[in-house]
């Protein structure tokens, strides 16, 4: 009988609850942070991919505009080479300066 009495009357430490750590809360929070890290990594990769695509587009656009401007300048030069020099027009333009 004495054995049963001791089992029922265990004295609990008063500070047991305050010093007890909740492991379940940490376990629940841990997957969220790893998922956030994965999402951030995926977003970072997407942003880098889009930046590279825009840089390539800008380079292509610059090359395209250069080729267009060179073609137009060459056409103007060819057009002016075929015409005789207009001295009166040249003197009028110089007078405006």
Curated annotation (Swiss-Prot):
Disulfide bonds: none
Keywords: Acetylation, Nucleus, Phosphoprotein
Keyword Cytoplasm carried by entry: no
Subcellular location: Nucleus, Nucleolus
Residue(s) carrying N6-acetyllysine: 21
Pfam (any one): DUF4665
InterPro entries: RBIS
Highest taxon of source: Eukaryota
Modified residues (Phosphoserine): 19, 69
Annotated GO biological process: ribosome biogenesis
GO CC terms in record: cytosol; nucleolus; nucleoplasm
Main subcellular location of this protein, as a coarse class: nucleus
Function, in words: Trans-acting factor in ribosome biogenesis required for efficient 40S and 60S subunit production.
Assembly with partners or alone: Associates with the pre-60S ribosomal particles.
Protein's name in the database: Ribosomal biogenesis factor
Gene: Rbis
């Amino acid at each position: 009988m004495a054995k049963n009495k001791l089992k029922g009357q265990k004295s609990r430490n008063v500070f047991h609850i305050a010093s007890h750590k909740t492991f379940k809360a940490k376990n629940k929070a841990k997957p969220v942070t790893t998922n956030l890290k994965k999402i951030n990594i995926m977003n970072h990769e997407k942003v880098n991919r889009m930046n590279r695509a825009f840089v390539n587009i800008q380079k292509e656009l610059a090359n395209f505009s250069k080729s267009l401007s060179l073609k137009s300048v060459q056409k103007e030069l060819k057009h002016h080479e075929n015409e005789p020099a207009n001295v009166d027009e040249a003197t009028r333009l110089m007078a405006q300066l």
